[in-house]
């Protein structure tokens, strides 16, 4: 029967793909029309997307609009031989993260703002964020995904003016939050002090 050698956790969204590596994918007559790849008991091709046998050692799974699910992948050949990737769990995730609130709208370097919502974390995999199109860094901001419902953002050394927070979940679903944050490290400037003699 076919063998596979993947041993990691993978997240996939509606336009994402997964590649399975191994052997015996063609010489055993494996074909997607035979329901040859399953996520737990669900046939991948009919439930989630398409299966493409690229060669004897590679299969590509494309995820369509199927619902959210998680489980281990099983590969089945025409003879009925099957192999389950026992240490490999697939998360099919077509649900975007949702942001409901930002605790403050303006922070300076070292100050924090808390973004709350849902879908920020899936198992050990965490979402990433950008603010005003900028990635995290010492001069922009840093962040910690505290839980699936909370992200703590810390202001960096530079400035970001009214930047929209965009959350990308572990599967790659991108969510514009309609929540904005300004990082402001510019001190007010006093040019003169006028006095008046009475």
Residue ranges of model-derived segments:
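Conserved structural position at the C-terminal beta-strand
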Residues: 75-77, 167-169
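Proline-centered linker/hinge motifs at extracellular inter-domain junctions
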Residues: 2, 30, 97, 188-189
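A structural signal for beta-strand boundary/capping segments at domain termini and interdomain linkers
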Residues: 82-83, 174-176
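A short glycine/threonine-centered beta-strand motif
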Residues: 16-27, 110-124
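Short, surface-exposed alpha-helix to beta-strand junction/turn motifs within ectodomains of secreted
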Residues: 26-47, 119-139
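Surface-exposed, short loops/turns at beta-strand junctions within beta-sandwich domains
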Residues: 61-69, 154-162
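Short, solvent-exposed loop/linker segments at the N-terminal edge
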Residues: 7-15, 104-110, 196-198
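Flexible, low-complexity linkers/stalks enriched in Thr/Pro that connect modular domains
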Residues: 86-96, 179-188, 196
